[in-house]
Amino acid sequence: MEGKIIQVLGPVVDVEFESYLPAIFEALDINFEVNGVQKSLVLEVAAHLGGNRVRAIAMDMTEGLVRNQVVKARGKMIEVPVGEGVLGRIFNVVGESIDNLEPLKPSLIWPIHRKAPSFEQQSTKTEMFETGIKVIDLLAPYSKGGKVGLFGGAGVGKTVIIMELIHNVAYKHNGYSVFAGVGERTREGNDLYFEMKEGGVLDKVALCYGQMNEPPGARNRIAFTGLTMAEYFRDEKGLDVLMFIDNIFRYAQSGAEMSALLGRIPSAVGYQPTLAGEMGKLQERIASTKNGSITSVQAVYVPADDLTDPAPASVFAHLDATTVLNRKIAEKGIYPAVDPLDSTSRILSPQMIGEKHYEIATGIQQVLQKYKDLQDIIAILGLDELSEEDKKIVERARKIEKFLSQPFFVAEVFTGSPGKYVTLQETLEGFRGILEGKYDHIPENAFYMVGSIQEVLEKAKSMKNS
């Protein structure tokens, strides 16, 4: 099953076989020498060109390839290691460990292209996924097996939220996480690894990186590498897994780069004509089955802040919840800097989460919205010109804003204050009390960077005594 290279077009390689035609998605191997150094390269068949010729996408740099070099067909797809052994390790797109530790000897390998769960296998229950982060659980709750878009610019705390979620899943739900860095900056991937090591969550997460400097094939397929590892924990171990993709925009972008080289005519804004289908292929595999679930959190970069751009627009159709991070909130020193009015969730309805939760959440949003509307008046005339009713709303809104902040476990190293996991019950109890005016007598500083309402009362007491 040997062939030879007949053409190299950047990351796309055409190969001719004599009597064998490899299937679409089959892996091909090339071993070659560059300046006296032995190199191996994996290709993946993307198109049949007629005759016994195929067009394949390279999973690494193609420097040093020449025509007539020997190519071996594997007879199977790219396969990656799965199982407990992948935890705490970093992998590239073809499942090789790249963390300079001992090479992994996997007991199990799975192909990266797999069918999405069928209708019969999918779970139809909608269950809330408790994160222990007050602002998310109250105002934009995640659902088990749901998909969440994490929107935010640089430096507002996307990575910290991702790490806290990994921590809480590991320690409260006893679950595992998989992180796929799709078109990541190498520096960010490196930082994440060491921050997780310091935060003590590394042994509960598998990391897969296809960095920004790699060819589009590697950046595109790395999402499937990570997803395959997550599917093993869901299907074979019956676990609820958390899957992080950073950044889903770059998955679409790498697809566009490959599409042009494969000779497809581009569609709107230069994207691949198959954009919606490719996005669906990835997203449909992220689902809850009767065994377990994969809940995914996907960072979404929005090019030029244009939400109608085809790439982010193709993601929106699949999302169940959005968590929007706001720089203005971060500047106030409120972390996590989640925007309570911009973040949304499909399950925020009385049928899904119950009347009580729904009433408290909408009550909180109304108070915050009213405060936002009053800010212009406050800026021009000052607080004293407001009616007594409005003054009360402003006071409560400021307490709510402060109470939406929370110390994180993974930030303990930097802040010195111990992290807090707040159950949904405690969250609802605290915010209901603020809405009902139970805590109108407590100074707003007592609400800042604490967990449950119990801690607010203790903090207020110690502030009074001191």
Swiss-Prot record:
Q: Which InterPro entries match?
A: AAA+_ATPase (IPR003593), ATP-synt_VA_C (IPR055190), ATP_synth_F1_bsu (IPR005722), ATPase_a/bsu_AS (IPR020003), ATPase_alpha/beta_chains (IPR050053), ATPase_F1/V1/A1_a/bsu_N (IPR004100), ATPase_F1/V1/A1_a/bsu_N_sf (IPR036121), ATPase_F1/V1/A1_a/bsu_nucl-bd (IPR000194)
* Cellular-component GO terms for this entry: plasma membrane; proton-transporting ATP synthase complex
The record, for Pfam families, names: ATP-synt_ab, ATP-synt_ab_N, ATP-synt_VA_C
- Which superkingdom? Bacteria
> Membrane topology for this entry?
Peripheral membrane protein
Q: Name one GO molecular function term.
A: ATP hydrolysis activity
Q: Read off the CDD domains from this record.
A: ATP-synt_F1_beta_C, ATP-synt_F1_beta_N, F1-ATPase_beta_CD
Instruction: Please state which protein family the record places this protein in.
Output: Belongs to the ATPase alpha/beta chains family.
Instruction: Write down what this protein is called.
Output: ATP synthase subunit beta
Q: Which organism is it from?
A: Helicobacter acinonychis (strain Sheeba)
